[in-house]
Amino acid sequence: MPRALWTAWVWAVIILSMEGASHQASSLSCDPTGVCDGHSRSLNSIPSGLTDGVKSLDLSNNEITYVSNRDLQRCVNLKTLRLGANEIHTVEEDSFFHLRNLEYLDLSYNRLSNLSSSWFRSLYALKFLNLLGNVYKTLGETSLFSHLPNLRTLKVGNSNSFTEIHEKDFTGLIFLEELEISAQNLQIYVPKSLKSIQNISHLILHLKQPVLLVDILVDIVSSLDCLELRDTNLHTFHFSEASISEMNTSVKKLIFRNVQFTDESFVEVVKLFNYVSGILEVEFDDCTHDGIGDFRALSLDRIRHLGNVETLTIRKLHIPQFFLFHDLSSIYPLTGKVKRVTIESSKVFLVPCLLSQHLKSLEYLDLSENLMSEETLKNSACKDAWPFLQTLVLRQNRLKSLEKTGELLLTLKNLNNLDISKNNFLSMPETCQWPGKMKQLNLSSTRIHSLTQCLPQTLEILDVSNNNLDSFSLILPQLKELYISRNKLKTLPDASFLPVLSVMRISGNIINTFSKEQLDSFPQLKALEAGGNNFICSCDFLSFTQGQQALARVLVDWPDGYRCDAPSHVRGQRVQDARLSLSECHRAAVVSAVCCALFLLLLLTGVLCHRFHGLWYMKMMWAWLQAKRKPRKAPRRDLCYDAFVSYSEQDSYWVENLMVQELEHFNPPFKLCLHKRDFVPGKWIIDNIIDSIEKSRKTIFVLSENFVRSEWCKYELDFSHFRLFDENNDAAILILLEPIDKKAIPQRFCKLRKIMNTKTYLEWPTDETQQEAFWLNLRAAIRS
């Protein structure tokens, strides 16, 4: 029994393992180019069966714990390997040995406590390596990266346990485009640890405290282009002038991201700008200033300028003690050389006039997403403010009057580019005043409904996108670029209003078509973006757009941006792919052809009817239908005649002088119905024939050549054909007055031809001795 249980347990383990392997294989999806995606699929190991066809493998965000030297040995062509956000705690020595073509390796956010240089010794082609977020304390006992000559991006460290940087750590690295070091708890930095790297384009340092920051700066200041400091509290930062005062610096840009300052540490940073003379650009992003701006007490006035800083960017600056903040007058003298200033999302409602006047070199000012209004703008754009300002961005502030805004900016004599988008103007006055050199104006997302002559005639670029405009009828003789997307325009603007227009963006309106003539009317048009409209794919429109190869060079969003909205059977299709039927595109020709065909058909029908007596058949059909509406057989009391006689007018002598004498003067007499005397005057002759036959017990047909040629005899015979012969009775009596060639009987008298072949008929004898027998037989036939 225990043996059986043991066997069952072994088989269960094998089956579950096979199911797990099958599940993992099915969880990995690969496309024909060798890109395999297995991220976020709860994998606990690297799937088996990987081949040399795999070029990119994404296994991030799984539960993989172990990488063996067999997992990837066949992936010799692998270039990208993503193993981030797993539970990897062990990587065997030769796990990546066969990946000689690998260029991108991500091992971030795992549980690696020790790093080994043997992992990377064969990765000569590696360009990107991410080791962030693991639990190691150091970068190993030997140089990790000495075998990576092509490495350009390196990310190392973690936020908790990484505490030491040693001189050997970066040995072998000569040039890096980006180096990111996460060392919030860094305790030991051995001098010259980063000095071995001769050139670093961008260094990102995550440091909680600035204790070792100056030591790091000393090593990199001569080989670094851009330094980015993240998540750092600079409350205790102190800049040592002697440390770098005599060094050749190459740093051009400083970025502070999520950094905390005090008044004191801010002054220390300003000192740094003076001594690192190469700094041209400074950026503060999502930083906090824990102070009140009392820089005068900190001897800031002894600093004459900000070094060579030309560009200053501040985004999302937080000042907890904002209402206690000083007037910043102590920093005014430092701003004389600054050319570009951006202050976004920082609750700026006023730039003091005195500060504006000190910004004598300012050419670009961006105050987007702040609280500027016309009242405060009046103080900011005071006399002599920003004398060389060319570009002013006031996007998403609290401006409401377009007329007043233009008047307030008249002091800016050199202003040529104004962005006042995302303000709530609603309407536009008929006339406005603007600085005389205005060339670019952005009024997008301002909720305006119409455009007026308020716009300056000197404009070369105008953006009125995302408004409520339904027309454009302004004359702007110098306008070169028009951005008017996401409005309610139904057609392209009139080209005569815009004679030098070269770029037009008009997507997302309700335009349903445009023509070659319209585009040709813009002689200098080089780029048109008109996608996202509700195009009616008419034949002319499709012929124009699909037949002009050069059009693709003008339509910048062709072909994917152009979709049909009508007709319904091509709705949603790309204009380039839509096809219409011949009848839709050449309706007049098709209608003409159909009319011609109908005419020919009618003509052919008429010829055939004449040739095959079609009209006669129609008349007979009508007569038959008339007869159908009457009882099949008249009641006995309605029978008025013993026989109806159908004969030709040319045979009337025989009928009236011989037949009538022999039958009506016989005893007992027979009552005959003759059309000459018994038809009702004024009644339609067809109805007379039908009524007479129905009121007669028998119908006598006097057949002769004249009978066959008689029109009325044909009617009488054919009615009998429909009414009497189809009843399979003996109501019809045929008298052959003279011999008739059966071939002379028309084909339409098929019933008569058949009867003459199958039924006995009475033949008028020319011998007088036989005529008495003829009359005797005729009387007997009538009585039967």
From Swiss-Prot:
Residues 525-579 form the LRRCT domain. The record marks 349 as: Interaction with bacterial lipopeptide. Pfam families: LRR_8 (PF13855), TIR (PF01582). Its main location: membrane. Glycans are attached at residues 114, 199, 248, 442. Residues 609-784 are cytoplasmic. LRR repeats lie at residues 54-77, 78-101, 102-125, 126-150, 151-175, 176-199, 200-223, 224-250, 251-278, 279-308, 309-337, 338-361, 362-388, 389-414, 415-437, 438-457, 458-478, 479-500, 501-524. InterPro entries: Cys-rich_flank_reg_C, Leu-rich_rpt, Leu-rich_rpt_typical-subtyp, LRR_dom_sf, TIR_dom, Toll-like_receptor, Toll_tir_struct_dom_sf. Disulfide bonds join 30-36, 353-382, 432-454. GO terms for biological process: cellular response to diacyl bacterial lipopeptide; cellular response to triacyl bacterial lipopeptide; inflammatory response; innate immune response; toll-like receptor signaling pathway. Ester-bound lipid substrates are bound through a crevice formed between the LRR 11 and LRR 12. The ATG16L1-binding motif mediates interaction with ATG16L1. Cooperates with LY96 to mediate the innate immune response to bacterial lipoproteins and other microbial cell wall components. Cooperates with TLR1 or TLR6 to mediate the innate immune response to bacterial lipoproteins or lipopeptides. Acts via MYD88 and TRAF6, leading to NF-kappa-B activation, cytokine secretion and the inflammatory response. May also promote apoptosis in response to lipoproteins. Belongs to the Toll-like receptor family. Interacts with LY96, TLR1 and TLR6 (via extracellular domain). TLR2 seems to exist in heterodimers with either TLR1 or TLR6 before stimulation by the ligand. The heterodimers form bigger oligomers in response to their corresponding ligands as well as further heterotypic associations with other receptors such as CD14 and/or CD36. Binds MYD88 (via TIR domain). Interacts with TICAM1. Interacts with CNPY3. Interacts with ATG16L1. Interacts with PPP1R11. Interacts with TICAM2. Interacts with TIRAP. This is Toll-like receptor 2. The gene is TLR2.
